[in-house]
C-alpha cells in the first residue's frame, strides 16, 4: 500500500478527488490513507475508496435484495411455471441453492439459455460446450451419463422436467426482480456490465488494488474500464510464484491478470520471499492452547504501544476469536478486530433458539403442556436467571418432582416467566414473542457505563442485530411475502442469525490487529502470528 500511495502521488499529484481506489475489501483503505498522507507536507485531496461490491452497487440502478425476500419471489415464479403444489416450507432451503446457481451463472457471464438447454435433445447439448471450460465440460459429461434413456427413473424424469423449465424460471425471475427494483448479487453485477456507459462514469480513474482471482464479470468490468483508459492496476504478488518456478499453481491467476492488465509497479518491487525471515513453528495440543500462547508472543514482540499496529494475529480458524479475545494480555492497550464476531457465539443466539424450541417442539397443543426438556433448557439460560429470581428454584422443583409435562400455569411465577411461558401460535405471534423477550434482555445493558468491556459491547450489539433481524422477518410476514410453518420459521431464524456477524467499533488504523486470512489482503505487518495453521484450515479444502 505504501508503494501504491507513492506511485499514485507521483503520477497524479495531490489532487486525487477525481480518482477512486477499489479494494477487494474495505480494510486496506484505512491504512492506504495513512501512507498517502505521508507523501507530502501539503494538503492532499484524498481519493474516494470502496470495495468492489460497493462499486457495483453504486453503479447499479437496482438494490441488493433481502435474501429472504429473494427466495419468496423465486417461489412465486417456481409455482407458476411448474404448477407445483410444493409449499414454501419445502421449497425455501433448496430455493437458496437455486439462487446461488443463478448467481454463479451471472457472475461468470454464462449464456443461461445454453446452460439450461433441453435435456431431451441431449446430443445438441453435449455438442455445444463452447461456453464451458475443460473441467466444467468433463463434470457435465460425467453427470449426464446418469441420464441415458435406458436408465431413467421417475425421479430422473421429474428432474429432467424441472431442468426443462429452469431457463424460463431464470428469465422470469430476473424480470420480476427488475420490476421490483431489486436483484441478487450476480444479477446486479451482470446488469452493470451490460448497461455500463464508460463516458458517464463519475471518476476519471479507477484504481484496482490487490485483487487475485477474478470471476468473468469482474474481468469484463476491468476490461471495459481499461479500454476507456479509465483504469490502473496494482497487483500484490511475489516473483517466486511468477518467474522462479514455471507454472507454479499459486501464481496461475496472478500471471493471467498481469498479462491482461499490466501492473503499474515494476517487478523489482515484488522480490521479497527470498529475503531472510525469522519463522518459528510452535505445536500445541489443542486450538485453545494456541490462543493461550498469545501473552508470551506479545511480550516477545511488543515493546511500546506505538508498535501495536505492527503486529497482527491471524486466525485461520475464525471460531478461535472468542478464546483469543480472552487471551490478549492487559499490556496491549488497543486492539482492532477486523472480522465480525459471529452472532451464533453470543448468549442471545442460544436464548432465541431455546425460546423457539420451547414454543414449537416443546409445547403440546393437544394436552396444553410443555415438555420438561425445553422448559429446563430455557430456565437454565443465564438471561432467564438474571431476569427472574424464580427461574433457578423453579427448575430445581421441576427436576425434584419429576414434572415431565408441566402446565403453563405452573410456570408463571413472575412477570417475566408469564411472558416466557405463555403459549404462542402462528408465525406473527412468534416474532412478537421474540422481540418482547429481546426488549426485556436489553434492560440488563441499560446502564452502558457499567458494561464498557468488549464483551458487553458485543452482547448489546448482538441484541440489536437480533431485534432488527426478527423485525425484518415480521415485515415480510405482514406483507404476505413470507408464509411458512412455525417449524420452518424456527429453522429460518436460526439460519439467518447463524449467518450474521456483529461489527466491532473502534479506530482501525491503531492497535494490534486481529483478523481472518482474507482480511490480510494488501496489508503488511512486522510481526504476525498465525493460529490454527493446520491441514483442513489453511486451505479449508483441496
Residue ranges and their predicted role:
Residues 1-542:
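Nucleic acid-machinery interaction/catalytic patches
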